[in-house]
Amino acid sequence: MRQESLVTKYDYDFENDSIFFYGSNKKYRSSIDLDGIILDIGEDDQIMAIEILDASNRFNLAKEDLRNIKYFEARIEVSEENIRLTMKMSVNKRNKLVDKGLDALGLNSINLPISTQGIELNC
């Protein structure tokens, strides 16, 4: 089953170097931490937000660049055992778009149902 969600906002916490993509009106159920990438899950078992800790190091960008995100997308593949997250992001750096990617893999420790989900944000 494939589900698409459109996140409507992002916040970058410069001091703590974390990005939070959100915007869903779903009710929160729980979170799962994929080694510093936190997925918030709604009552419908769909991903409703993503927080990326230590973001500048993970994306190999200056912290200032993370204030200029122009596009973000994430694909979340849930199996019985694992959750695989693939992210792509474009930032405006010196009037030029720079594309970055990041992958994460973790255990499906909260028994989410098997699914493929997508999240997208255009700024």
Swiss-Prot record:
GO BP of this protein: purine ribonucleoside salvage
Cysteine pairings via disulfide bonds: none
Single GO MF annotation: transferase activity
Keywords: Purine salvage, Transferase
Coiled coil: none
Enzyme Commission code: 2.-.-.-
Disruption phenotype: Cells have increased resistance to the purine analog 8-aza-2,6-diaminopurine (8-ADP).
Functional summary from the UniProt entry: May play a role in purine salvage.
Protein name, UniProt field: Putative hypoxanthine phosphoribosyltransferase
Organism: Methanosarcina mazei (strain ATCC BAA-159 / DSM 3647 / Goe1 / Go1 / JCM 11833 / OCM 88) (Methanosarcina frisia)
